[in-house]
């Protein structure tokens, strides 16, 4: 990517975040174009893409035959097909899997590194962007396109915007916002996604979890009414037979080191500690707090105490901004 990522700063929680412009270099864009795009994606992802309008974006999962996610995709309509945003570490293997059946369809599936991904969040983010675009997305219209730019709106953990654009517009936005906005890299957007309870699937956890283990059903990412797609039988079984015993949790506290994706944590059981869960993502905030996104049993007691393995510090469950009740 020719557009240079901004230097890192320690991320801040949404409630205290000043106006911030972020380069999303740890995320990557991919596209599907061609006459069969919608039909092809409908047979590959958990969401009902045939019902998607130009004004919507959604989080869908792309699964293997056993219902385990290669990746989750932030999906929106783009040109005569679709585009999606996923973690850069999983894009290449995810596209390889997606292309396996494409030989029989009129589609072109490709990575897109020409466009730039930026995030805008923090204090008065909407007001800052209102000076630069004629229309901004909102709850009613979550995707807005203007020229070479697509803007995606997010409600949680606080209003924020993801911008997909060309290099010239990215440079213009940076020049216009540089004076009033802090600049940061992907870690700040990652911190906001963790706070929002959006599952982060990096390479270490690709092919490990069914979508419901990461709360995708609570985020509107699974249609149980659409036709066949890869992995559907297992995803449906998890819902209708209660086969899923896991959920995505948000933990906050302190830790002397940050656990890596794929690592387990320890749960306090009386005087002892027992290994539990799988870490998806972690960040350390500027106030020293550590936030951890982890998949664990879905029946954890709300007052449970956790720690990074053999650590002296502890982590506790924080509420997510959505309900898991079905």
UniProtKB/Swiss-Prot annotation:
It comes from the Bacteria. GO terms for cellular component: cytoplasm. The lineage of its organism: Bacteria, Pseudomonadati, Pseudomonadota, Gammaproteobacteria, Enterobacterales. Its main location: cytoplasm. Keywords: Cytoplasm, Folate-binding, tRNA processing. It holds the Pfam family YgfZ_barrel. Gene3D superfamilies: 2.40.30.160, 3.30.70.1630, Aminomethyltransferase beta-barrel domains. Folate-binding protein involved in regulating the level of ATP-DnaA and in the modification of some tRNAs. It is probably a key factor in regulatory networks that act via tRNA modification, such as initiation of chromosomal replication. Belongs to the tRNA-modifying YgfZ family. The gene is ygfZ. InterPro entries: GCV_T_N, GcvT/YgfZ_C, tRNA-modifying_YgfZ, YgfZ/GcvT, YgfZ/GcvT_CS, YgfZ_barrel. It is found in: Cytoplasm. The keyword ATP-binding does not apply. GO terms for molecular function: folic acid binding. This is tRNA-modifying protein YgfZ. It comes from Escherichia coli O6:H1 (strain CFT073 / ATCC 700928 / UPEC).
């Amino acid at each position: 990517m020719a557009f240079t990522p901004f230097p890192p700063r320690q991320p801040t929680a949404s409630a205290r975040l000043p106006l911030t412009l972020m380069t999303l270099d740890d995320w990557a864009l991919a596209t599907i174009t061609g006459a069969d795009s919608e039909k092809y994606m409908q047979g590959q992802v958990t969401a009902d893409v045939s019902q998607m309008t130009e004004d919507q974006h959604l989080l869908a999962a792309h699964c293997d035959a056993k219902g385990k996610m290669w990746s989750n995709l932030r999906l929106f309509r783009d040109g005569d097909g679709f585009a999606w945003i996923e973690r850069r570490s999983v894009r290449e293997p995810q596209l390889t899997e997606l292309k396996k059946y494409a030989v029989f369809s009129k589609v072109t599936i490709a990575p897109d590194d020409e466009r730039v991904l930026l995030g805008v969040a923090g204090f008065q983010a909407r007001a800052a962007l209102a000076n630069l675009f004629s229309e901004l997305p909102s709850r009613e219209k979550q995707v807005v396109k203007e020229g070479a730019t697509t803007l995606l709106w997010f409600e949680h953990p606080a209003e924020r915007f993801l911008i997909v654009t060309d290099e010239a517009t990215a440079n213009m936005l940076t020049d216009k916002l540089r004076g009033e906005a802090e600049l940061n890299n992907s870690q700040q957007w990652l911190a906001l996604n963790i706070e929002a309870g959006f599952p982060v699937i990096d390479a270490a956890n690709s092919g490990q979890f069914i979508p419901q283990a990461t709360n995708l059903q609570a985020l509107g990412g699974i249609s149980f009414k659409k036709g066949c797609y890869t992995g559907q039988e297992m995803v449906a079984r998890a819902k209708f037979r209660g086969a899923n015993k896991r959920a995505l949790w948000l933990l906050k506290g302190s830790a002397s080191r940050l656990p890596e994706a794929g690592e387990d944590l320890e749960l306090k059981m009386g005087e002892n500690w027992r290994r539990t869960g799988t870490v998806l993502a972690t960040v350390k905030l500027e106030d020293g707090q550590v936030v951890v996104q982890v998949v664990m049993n879905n029946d954890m007691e709300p007052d449970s105490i956790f720690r990074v393995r053999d650590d002296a510090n502890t982590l506790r469950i924080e509420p997510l901004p959505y309900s898991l009740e079905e």
